[in-house]
Amino acid sequence: MAKAATPKTTAAAEAKPAAAKAPAKKAPAKTAAAKSDAAPKAAKTGAVGKITQVIGAVVDVQFEDGQLPLILNALETDNLGSRLVLEVAQHLGENTVRTIAMDSTEGLVRGHEVRDTGNPIMVPVGEETLGRIMNVIGEPVDEAGPIKTTARRAIHQEAPEYIEQSTEAEILVTGIKVVDLLAPYAKGGKIGLFGGAGVGKTVLIMELINNVAKAHGGYSVFAGVGERTREGNDLYHEMIESGVNKLGGGEGSKAALVYGQMNEPPGARARVALSGLTVAENFRDKGQDVLFFVDNIFRFTQAGSELSALLGRIPSAVGYQPTLATDMGAMQERITTTTKGSITSVQAIYVPADDLTDPAPATSFAHLDATTTLNRSIAEKGIYPAVDPLESTSRMLDPMIVGEEHYAVARQVQSILQRYKSLQDIIAILGMDELSEDDKLTVARARKIERFLSQPFFVAEVFTGSPGKLVDLADTIKGFKGLCAGEYDHLPEPAFYMVGSIEEAIEKAKKLAAEAA
């Protein structure tokens, strides 16, 4: 297998795209070794083969002696007037390669000509991608014209060397109370959003994009992996409405979008996360702090499982691919902070049948710095974001990183909620009257804390009618510290529901009292 280029090779080639052109005959070997950011024209120098078999998304191509393309090379063919890209997955013998199609194979016939590009799939990178939507092979799909850049980068790259990686610990303040207090995100870390269907993963991701663009002014890259096309379209238009992006891209846009949605073949869904990550890596290597969102990382695993079956590999546990850990590790190791810049990754992880022991979410756990677990029972109470304060974790919740006060308040909040959870069986059987006075007080405070963990979102304004709130970390700590100490025991429970700071809760309590009078 050819070794992927380091970012250094890429940067050099970006400066001189023309230099990457190789002699006609030796193009496949040379360009695949370099994997440089050549302009796409350089790709037209490779060997030509013929299609021998088409089975769904799997296409076999036969080449002449000595012209076999390398594993992971991109091959191109014309399918009913449109460009179809195939990625080499296996060498079968008799000069035949087995490839995975990045788009529909309807219309392909045996004997059809296929050209080796000599490179892996190359996608456009740089600021010209901001505000645009592209697909897995870097083609714009937003009907706003071509992406005006010659800089391209291979989607298969090596992870940064150990000496290039940074080890500083710093919090990324999101403005979402439950996240900042109980499971804070590391700048340059990997965060998993766990939850079943319909508990609010995508809404939380959209709120994070919105808050980070407003509060930090950083670039974001959003990879839509195997999710609903409607949601992708909604996200694009909401970004334009909220000012995160400008229509058609250009100056002022803060996010690049890379989509491979539910209706795409498994090849596109398995590679689109890498295409998005490649765009993010380019920003990082130029000194940016980038946010990389993946919705949904489970679909990446699911697509890999489909491909594995199509390629005839023996399935592993629960029918997943035998290379599940390898595939996940190859991608996750590239998401890291270097001495140049950082990639903070937020990955929505669908949990099949709400089972956290399923191999797909379980494999993802190993790579994460923080987990935000969304719980259906919390969503059923109408508390949004439906983040489980006891299940969500973060390695950043350490007094050496967040400070003694933040750590003490977070642990106190969790202990009150844990005590309430353990009392719920007694309450269900015997009722509140059988509890001691101390336990009654704990339950009352826990119910107020639960409601105070809710928060109106900017991106949900259209549904709720409540204006969104971005809460400062100091205000969050102050509010929960007072709640735990009993300073707000006199306020009614509804006053804490769907507010930002504690001052807003006090104001709401006054309004409720006035309405009752």
Swiss-Prot record:
Spans annotated as Disordered: 1-42
Pfam family, one: ATP-synt_ab
Keyword list, A-Z: ATP synthesis, ATP-binding, Cell inner membrane, Cell membrane, CF(1), Hydrogen ion transport, Ion transport, Membrane, Nucleotide-binding, Translocase, Transport
Extent of Low complexity compositional bias: 1-22, 29-42
GO molecular function term, any single one: proton-transporting ATP synthase activity, rotational mechanism
Subcellular location: Cell inner membrane
Keyword field contains Cell membrane: yes
Membrane topology: Peripheral membrane protein
The EC number(s) this enzyme carries: 7.1.2.2
Known catalytic reactions: ATP + H2O + 4 H(+)(in) = ADP + phosphate + 5 H(+)(out)
UniProt xrefs under InterPro entries: AAA+_ATPase, ATP-synt_VA_C, ATP_synth_F1_bsu, ATPase_a/bsu_AS, ATPase_alpha/beta_chains, ATPase_F1/V1/A1_a/bsu_N, ATPase_F1/V1/A1_a/bsu_N_sf, ATPase_F1/V1/A1_a/bsu_nucl-bd
Ligand binding (ATP): 195-202
Gene3D superfamilies from the UniProt entry: 2.40.10.170, Bovine Mitochondrial F1-atpase, Atp Synthase Beta Chain, Chain D, domain 3, P-loop containing nucleotide triphosphate hydrolases
UniProt-listed HAMAP family: ATP_synth_beta_bact (MF_01347)
Quaternary context: F-type ATPases have 2 components, CF(1) - the catalytic core - and CF(0) - the membrane proton channel. CF(1) has five subunits: alpha(3), beta(3), gamma(1), delta(1), epsilon(1). CF(0) has three main subunits: a(1), b(2) and c(9-12). The alpha and beta chains form an alternating ring which encloses part of the gamma chain. CF(1) is attached to CF(0) by a central stalk formed by the gamma and epsilon chains, while a peripheral stalk is formed by the delta and b chains.
Role summary: Produces ATP from ADP in the presence of a proton gradient across the membrane. The catalytic sites are hosted primarily by the beta subunits.
PANTHER family noted in UniProt: ATP SYNTHASE, ATP SYNTHASE SUBUNIT BETA, MITOCHONDRIAL
Membership in a protein family: Belongs to the ATPase alpha/beta chains family.
Protein name: ATP synthase subunit beta
Biological classification of the source: Bacteria, Pseudomonadati, Pseudomonadota, Alphaproteobacteria, Hyphomicrobiales
